[in-house]
Design a protein with these regions (language model features):
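Membrane-helix boundary/helix-loop-helix interface segments in multi-pass membrane proteins
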Residues: 2-40, 46-181, 346-361, 365, ...
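Transmembrane alpha-helix boundary/anchor motif
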Residues: 79, 87, 144, 219, ...
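Hydrophobic alpha-helical segments of polytopic membrane proteins
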Residues: 97-98, 104, 160-178, 183-224
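Hydrophobic, glycine- and aromatic-enriched re-entrant/interface helices and adjoining loop segments
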Residues: 116-122, 127-130, 209-303, 322-330
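Alpha-helical transmembrane segments of multi-pass membrane proteins, especially transporters
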Residues: 135, 143, 161-166, 189, ...
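Interfacial segments of multi-pass membrane proteins
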Residues: 149, 187-206, 274-300, 359-374
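Loop-to-helix entry and N-terminal half of a specific, functionally important transmembrane alpha helix
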Residues: 319-357, 363
């Protein structure tokens, strides 16, 4: 006897879904600002490839020894930019003080590191290169100032709220950086802090008082500087008359001015710099702008300046349309930091101010600086999305 088998219906195939990363749908970031950042990164890498080739070949036997790690840092930095642009920037309310505490610990730790060119600015990480704590300190100062101002904006005219906490933070950070010594970084952080305090509503009388005190402090420092800070005194003397010591402290400035003068209107052409062949001691770092002027001329120099001006202008525009005060202050802090650092670097290269050792954002060799910079630009893009 045959038993009929129960016929089961053929199951329908389950629909196949494409794998997607669990990311939120966010408003679009500001495209003009992103394009400016990417243009500066690309321009900087091209100029670093040219400016560093000779010194890299001489020092390390590899013409791309400075470019290769910078490409890696740029890639990591762009990933950081993308991630930061997708993070709700309000999280930095909670991270501001812990990051400042971390930066202070690192600024103390760096004082126990070996000297390089008369300074102690880098923490050596075996197998991972170096870390510059001042870059983290700049980031932390912007976060802390933006956080404090945004929650106390209606009391910023009072000394105990609008001056004292900021003066304490700047005083501690500046003192630690001066011990390295890192004069340019100190000036930069003081400048960033002053701008944020002014934008945040600190009373004008306190700025006048600070200005008078600053002039008095500088006057006193000029008198006692040779005994107190020989490093700064040497830089000041070489600025006033670099040709007094053409083979010593004035050598870098003189060779930089030669490079700028050689460029003329249109430059010698990309890759054709003569001064990068061991005449300018640090063509891949603080003095890369002189190589830009030599190879690309006045036109190329104006293009670099124009990009930084546009970045600042776009940042101010984004700050004006930010969803809240905290976001606006973050954008102002980070874009002013880039612009002010670029101005200080170009002023040093052209001998307008003493050589204080400050890099050109997006152009100079340096992994910590580039990655932190791109992370900061990511925060600006996060604010530009307009989410409250």
């Amino acid at each position: 006897m045959l038993h009929s088998e129960t016929i089961r219906p053929t199951p329908r195939p389950t629909p196949r879904h494409r794998f997607r990363l669990p990311l939120r749908q966010l408003p679009a970031m500001d495209l003009p600002f992103l394009v400016l950042v990417l243009t500066l990164v690309g321009f900087g890498l091209v100029m670093l490839a040219s400016a560093s080739s000779a010194v890299a070949l001489y020092r390390r036997g590899d013409a791309w020894a400075y470019l290769r790690p910078q490409l890696l840092y740029a890639a990591l930095g762009l990933v950081g930019l993308w991630l930061a642009s997708r993070v709700d920037y309000h999280i930095f309310h909670k991270l501001a003080w812990p990051l400042l505490a971390l930066s202070l610990v690192l600024l103390v730790a760096v004082l126990f590191m070996p000297e390089y060119n008369g300074c102690k600015r880098w923490l050596v990480r075996p197998g991972l290169g170096t870390l510059q704590p001042s870059e983290i300190a700049k980031f932390a100062v912007v976060l802390v100032f933006s956080h404090v101002i945004s929650i106390n904006h209606d009391q910023m005219k009072r000394f105990s709220v609008g001056v004292l906490p900021f003066a304490l933070v700047l005083g501690v950070v500046a003192a630690l950086m001066l011990l390295e010594p890192h004069l340019s970084g100190t000036l930069l952080i003081l400048g960033i802090g002053a701008v944020l305090m002014f934008v945040g509503g600190t009373g004008l009388k306190w700025f006048v008082l600070a200005g008078v005190s600053g002039v008095a402090a500088i006057g006193a420092a000029v008198v006692i500087m040779p005994d107190l800070v020989p490093y700064a005194a040497d830089r000041l003397n070489s600025w006033l008359d670099p040709f007094a010591d053409p083979l010593g402290d004035g050598h870098q400035t003189i060779q930089s001015l030669y490079a700028i003068g050689s460029g003329g209107a249109a430059g010698l052409g990309l890759g054709n710099s003569r001064q990068k062949h061991l005449f300018v001691p640090e063509p891949q770092n603080d003095f890369i702008f002189s190589i830009v002027c030599e190879e690309l001329g006045f036109v190329g120099a104006c293009a670099v300046v124009g990009l930084f001006v546009l970045l600042l202008w776009r940042g101010i525009t984004l700050a004006a349309h930010a969803p809240d005060r905290f976001g606006a202050l973050l954008v102002v802090g980070f874009t002013v930091q880039v612009a002010l650092q670029a101005v200080l670097n170009m002023a040093v290269v052209t001998n307008t101010i003493p050589n204080t050792g400050i890099s050109l954002p997006f152009f100079s060799s340096g992994g910590t600086s580039l990655m932190m910079l791109l992370g900061e630009m990511g925060v600006v893009l996060s604010v530009s999305r307009g989410e409250t």
